[in-house]
Amino acid sequence: HYNCPVVAYYPEVIAANVGDAAKITLIHDYLGLHRKRDFPVKAHAMLNQYFDGISLKEVKKAAKAAYEEYYGYFEKVRARGEETAEKQGKEVIVLAGRPYHVDPEINHGIDKLIASYGVAIISEDVISSRVKKFHTGVLNQWTYHSRLYAAAHYLKDQPHMNLVQLVSFGCGVDAITTDEVRDILESEGKIYTQIKIDEITNL
């Protein structure tokens, strides 16, 4: 259960390269959100390295509220996506991108352009949880990649759904995901579509 290695190590890069970083409290300890039971204890130990007077009870309360909000967000995304996908007479495009691709300055309005052709658009978050574990041709350890592969696999029994993958030039790891998603889709008789985004600010 890992996140993007580039993003995960931004704090390390800052600490090593920004001289003024030593003058501020830069917290970049490693915590696993997937271990819900252990998280409050580890978060409490981490916070006590930097601040005084934070009790374990307070951290447990905050963690409980945070997890509820986290899971609630995904439930809302899935519910809205399912509502969109079930509209009568509409083809569905699973527009799969990294989390930062929801930023209009990055995605260039590609979602709106595709929607203008009369299709419904959902994200991979909506359907990825419907798939049980399955074999992949690559080491499947990153959170986003797991959702992406699961979404592609789910489409095998969905004739009205197709997947479009957004890829940024700067993401080297997507050299792996694009090949695997292509293999999954083509093995299921689907056409793989990739849109590679550069760093301009319009279409």
Regions found by a protein language model. Name each.
Residues H1-L203:
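An N-terminal assembly and electron-transfer interface module characteristic of large anaerobic redox
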